[in-house]
From Swiss-Prot:
Saposin-B is a homodimer. Interacts with GRN; facilitates lysosomal delivery of progranulin from the extracellular space and the biosynthetic pathway. This is Saposin-B-Val. The one residue extended Saposin-B-Val is only found in a minority of the chains. GO terms for cellular component: extracellular region; late endosome; lysosome; membrane. Saposin-B stimulates the hydrolysis of galacto-cerebroside sulfate by arylsulfatase A (EC 3.1.6.8), GM1 gangliosides by beta-galactosidase (EC 3.2.1.23) and globotriaosylceramide by alpha-galactosidase A (EC 3.2.1.22). Saposin-B forms a solubilizing complex with the substrates of the sphingolipid hydrolases. It comes from Sus scrofa. The keyword tRNA processing does not apply. GO terms for biological process: lysosomal transport; sphingolipid metabolic process. Keywords: Disulfide bond, Glycoprotein, Lipid metabolism, Sphingolipid metabolism. It holds the Pfam family SapB_2. Disulfide bonds join 4-77, 7-71, 36-47. InterPro entries: SapB_2, Saposin, Saposin-like, SaposinB_dom. Residues 1-80 form the Saposin B-type domain. Glycans are attached at residue 21.
């Protein structure tokens, strides 16, 4: 498969989910915080704080960017 296209599709789906489902973001943030627990005691708290602080900004930024640009930023698509 084409990693770039897959990324664009995933970001598009995420943006649609955020737009149409108010609890989606909350679930995503909670899931991310649960993943933090894998890092061990000291790092887990730091990870959770980071998510609490930046998740809203990150989601707002994601909502205002084109999926292709986001995928380019994270390295799944060639920058144009």
């Amino acid at each position: 498969g084409d990693v770039c296209q897959d990324c664009i599709q995933m970001v598009t789906d995420l943006q649609n989910a955020v737009r149409t489902n108010s609890t989606f973001v909350e679930a995503l943030v909670n899931h991310a915080k649960e993943e933090c627990d894998r890092l061990g005691p000291g790092m887990a708290d730091m990870c959770k704080n980071y998510i609490s602080q930046y998740s809203e900004i990150a989601i707002q930024m994601m909502m205002h960017m084109q999926p292709k640009d986001i995928c380019g930023l994270v390295g799944f698509c060639e920058e144009v």
